């Protein structure tokens, strides 16, 4: 697949304090939670990974308003003896702001890993669950669970 797309644009507020999550090639990566409002007024708490280079010496604090541009990434982690697929917003650009017009978007192009599973929720909504493989550089892929409806 030549035209691979994996982009996200999220605006929200930092929830809690960012923590150093890991280090790769001498570069620290921070984990934080971003509270992103839905149109309904509910809030999603989304995990974000960002490089110390994006902070440029500053530190983010609880309640800071941010807009993040980046990609959806996935990785496997053993938690309590079982493998789990974890999904994170990998920030490639951050801007501190106070605007929340709900510009949140994710665009993905990939390959379906298995046939979509059609089901009806307890509230009667018809949905399809699927797993999308999105390629990235150096032969890696992100496996992203998706739900479609409507």
List the model feature ranges, each with a label.
Residues 1-150:
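Single-stranded nucleic acid-binding surfaces, predominantly the OB-fold ssDNA-binding core
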């Amino acid at each position: 697949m030549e035209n691979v797309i994996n982009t996200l644009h999220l605006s929200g507020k930092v929830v809690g304090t960012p923590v150093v999550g890991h280090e790769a090639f001498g570069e620290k990566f921070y984990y934080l939670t971003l509270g992103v409002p839905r149109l309904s007024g509910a809030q999603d708490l989304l995990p974000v990974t960002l490089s110390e280079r994006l902070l440029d010496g500053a530190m983010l604090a609880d309640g800071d308003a941010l807009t993040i541009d980046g990609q959806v990434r996935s990785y496997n982690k053993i938690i309590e003896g079982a493998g789990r697929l974890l999904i994170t917003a990998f920030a490639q650009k951050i801007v501190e702001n106070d605007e929340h017009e709900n510009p949140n978007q994710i665009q993905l192009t990939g390959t379906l890993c298995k046939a979509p599973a059609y089901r009806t929720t307890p509230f009667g909504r018809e949905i399809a669950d699927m797993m999308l493989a999105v390629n990235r550089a150096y032969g890696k892929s992100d496996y992203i669970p998706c739900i479609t409806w409507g």
